[in-house]
A protein has these predicted regions:
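Cap/insert and terminal regions of metallo-dependent hydrolase folds
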Residues: 4, 8-9, 15-45, 152, ...
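Metallo-beta-lactamase
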Residues: 1-128, 132-134, 140-146, 181-251, 326-330, ...
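Acidic/histidine-rich helix-loop elements
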Residues: 121-140, 223-229, 280-286, 314
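Active-site metal-binding motif and surrounding structural segment of the metallo-beta-lactamase
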Residues: 39, 131-179, 267-273
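Catalytic core of the metallo-beta-lactamase
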Residues: 105-111, 208-268, 284, 291-292
Length: 330
């Protein structure tokens, strides 16, 4: 019994020490926490979706679902070859050219009317463990040092595949402003970013950047958390309005009424960036199934749709290229 208790104590201490690493960030505090408490989207100690959103829908429970994900046979959820990719010299791009460069999964660079926007950059392993959630072979072409100067860094939520400590800290001195959902700014402040350059938004809020540029924070149907405790920070979608463009950044999340709401508020969207991958019937409300994607595209009515959240990490059991085939069939 003494040996068992000693081993258990050592294990608990090791986990606590591991989770005290800076990558995990820290919980919101002070004035930021008081603002969170005042949010209409925060109730009973956690942020809430607009509609009831169970994270798991299989009825199997969290541990059984995780066991299936880790050990159930998966058909082609990772490619068996290096994926072909083109590496663009981002620093040589004409800053006046309107364009989007995708880095795989949910990381991409947008240039719109001279504004450089970097969204959810993750150029390393999408987990705190170096051997877990590694990128597919051939998809890790870009590194933080390849990025040009960034005017606006947008983070949609704090999950490991969207917010990476190693990436953003290496970009800190080349980033003009960070825009993120309420509570996520705590990570950036903890990681050494100037608080004056951090803009946190709740759903329904907006930030004028000057020069005809505005960022609007709107709902998403998802959840948050980098530790065992979920939903202490908000998750969101964003609309970036430039002098000539309206761009929807969907972030992560399941289908809901917010897509139609965004379309009514921002008609004639030029581009909608939508998640298309890492879905499962086991968590159908927090990631869109293929039929949900089709409905979201129709609800938004954007002139162009760019599907992301695929082709770099295996976070679900579906074949790795199925999301691409689904998008091509729209």
């Amino acid at each position: 019994m003494i040996v068992f208790l000693a081993v258990a104590a050592l294990l608990v201490a090791a986990i606590a020490l591991f989770m005290n690493r800076p990558e995990f960030g820290r919980a919101p505090r002070g004035e930021r926490l008081e603002r969170i408490w005042r949010s209409p989207n925060y109730r009973d100690g956690a942020f809430r979706n607009r509609h009831a959103t169970p994270q798991l829908t299989s009825g199997k429970g969290w541990w059984a679902t995780m066991y299936d994900f880790l050990f159930e046979r998966k058909e082609r959820n990772r490619p068996d070859h290096a994926l072909p990719a083109v590496k663009t010299d981002l620093k040589a791009l004409d800053p006046k050219e309107n364009l989007l460069v995708w880095f795989g999964h949910s990381s991409y660079l947008i240039q719109a009317d001279g504004l450089r926007i970097l969204v959810d950059p993750v150029f390393e392993t999408a987990s705190p463990l170096p051997f877990f959630n590694r990128p597919f072979e051939g998809t890790d072409l870009y590194k933080p040092e390849d990025m040009p100067g960034i005017d606006l860094l947008v983070i949609t939520h704090d999950h490991w595949d969207h917010l990476d400590y190693g990436t953003v800290t290496k970009l800190r001195d080349r980033t003009g402003r960070v825009v993120c959902p309420l509570g996520v700014g705590e990570y950036f402040e903890y990681w050494g970013f100037d608080p004056q350059r951090i803009t946190e938004l709740d759903w329904g809020e907006q930030a004028a950047l000057g020069g005809g540029f505005t960022v609007y924070c709107r709902p998403a149907r998802h959840f948050s958390g980098r530790t065992f405790r979920a939903n202490r920070t908000l998750w969101a979608s964003f609309v970036v309005e430039t002098p000539s463009q309206r761009i929807f950044l969907g972030g992560d999340g399941g289908d809901d009424t917010h897509f139609a709401d965004v379309a009514r508020e921002f008609p004639n969207l030029d581009v909608a960036v939508l998640e298309d991958g890492q879905y499962s019937e086991d968590w159908r409300y927090i990631h869109m199934l293929p039929a949900d994607l089709k409905r979201a595209v129709e609800d938004l009515g954007a002139r162009r749709v760019f599907p992301v959240h695929n082709s770099k990490y295996a976070l679900a059991r579906h074949p790795w290229d199925e999301p691409l085939n689904n998008a091509a069939a729209l």
